Amino acid sequence: MNIFKQISSLIFSKLNELKQRGVISTSAANFIIEPPSNRVHGDIYTNVAMVLAKHEKKNPIEIAEVLAKEFELFDEVAKVEIAGSGFINMHLKIEVWHGILKQINELKTEFGTLDIGNNQAINVEFVSANPTGPLHIGHARGAVFGDVLANLLKKVGYKVTKEYYINDAGAQIDTLIRSVYLRYKEALGEKISIEKGLYPGEYLKPIGTGLAKKYGAELLEKQDNQVIRDYTLSSILEIIKEDMNLLGVNHDVFTSEYELQKSGKIEESIKILSDKGLVYEGYLEKPKGKESENWTSRKEMLFRSTKFGDDVDRALKKEDGSWTYFASDIAYHFDKISRGFNNMIVELGSDHGGYVKRLKAVVSALSDDQAKIEVKLHNIVNFFENGKPVKMSKRSGNFLTARDVVEEVGRDITRFIMLTRKNDMVLDFDFAKVKEQSKDNPIFYVQYAHARAHSLMRNAPKELPTADPSLLRTGGELFLIKTLAKWPDVVEIAARLCEPHRITFYLLEVAEAFHVLWGYGKSDLNMRFILEDNLNLTAARMFLVQALAHVIASGLSIFNIEPLEEMS
């Protein structure tokens, strides 16, 4: 039960009724309904009177007074108050909250599972790092974000495909092959010198050694050999998959840019755009910030992306006649649409912000506005040790890898901490803090709440009467129940906005409400969860504890994190 949607539905029905009775002239109100930030203002507030006032051209207080009388008739509502310039605050009956508590324990971890996706197919593309080396920590943030978002979308009823686009065409791959070829020669005993611009990483040595073992000297003088290319990319992709596996990330599909180009998908997709009159030969203006002496205007093949809200039209071919990277992007998204995906999400680093409008333009053009794409950007991660900036340099070379971080703090900690900030905000990751067993460590704080709940259930008397939730009436108990009741609403909002960090924030809120309630028992023995002389109240409180454990476990399952029943 999403109590906020339930009350919203009642309000909509009431507005339609009032319109039919001639009390108001419109019922179409895009109003807010959510829990107030201050508990004294009730359980739910809405600005519906203020929204209606604009349509009715009346004082919002006057409309609020009419609506308040009507809302008081709802079975779920105990009291209605008008606040400020027309806000309506509703206090729900205590029985509503007890009923939701029962529902949580009936549904267990399925509480919060929704069907807003209606089993629609959705493609979530994330990581898609160039296959030139191990995943660095920026990729790790994107990997966790994409994976958890995919899990979240599954929870709300979408049929999700997790995809990785292999950027295995272009200059960076040529550079990689030349770098591996040197390592191959080195493995055969030749002395090498790694020239500027090549990849110097030690991770390439085993690939060169593998080539030498498998082919001996057969590939010498064959730097551009397809065998070297295929072996290298296969080896690098295996490294990337191992890194992602350490993070708990697995993709369903890997799509190769190189294979797309070979299949003729670029030519096919460009022809479709051309047939729609969206490709032309023209000239681009000098980009802002570009020095005139470094800019030469030339006639180019262009895509009319400005027709779809982009800032400029986009070049499809380079000066040498080869396709641009953007042309490959067109082919790739044409391929997605051809596979039946009308809903797409792409995760990119914040340095790719300029791609957002052009990708939306392409998808809109190729699908005649039938397909939708959402581009989510992730920002950088700063690392600290006890508040001091640190740089880690291990076997991976001169950059911090995903493997380095997971091996330092563990998979679950890495996944959770990566979502303690909104994806487009800079994230600070303190190695010392995330290993602390304190409330300053977010994942510990949440896991400790779950473990504490299971400890209480293990230590409770074995023979308890049937739980009666109506015995739960203290402020702390009701606040925890109300916090748990928000879970379906949190899940839906997080999924609709593609913001899985909202789950993190909510779990911390739940953990805090529980820890505070547990703390009351230190100063007031009657507030303890287990009361040997009051088994009925103990049973009711264990019922609440059980519901809390279900909700936390449900939330952690979206992160693919195992909830702990005992802290080590």
UniProtKB/Swiss-Prot annotation:
A motif ('HIGH' region) lies at residues 129-139. Keywords: Aminoacyl-tRNA synthetase, ATP-binding, Cytoplasm, Ligase, Nucleotide-binding, Protein biosynthesis. Its EC number is 6.1.1.19. One of its GO terms (cellular component) is cytoplasm. It is found in: Cytoplasm. Pfam families: Arg_tRNA_synt_N, DALR_1, tRNA-synt_1d. GO terms for biological process: arginyl-tRNA aminoacylation. GO terms for molecular function: arginine-tRNA ligase activity; ATP binding. CDD domains: ArgRS_core. PANTHER family: ARGININE--TRNA LIGASE, CYTOPLASMIC, ARGINYL-TRNA SYNTHETASE. NCBIfam families: argS (TIGR00456). Belongs to the class-I aminoacyl-tRNA synthetase family. Monomer. This is Arginine--tRNA ligase. The lineage of its organism: Bacteria, Pseudomonadati, Pseudomonadota, Alphaproteobacteria, Rickettsiales. The gene is argS.
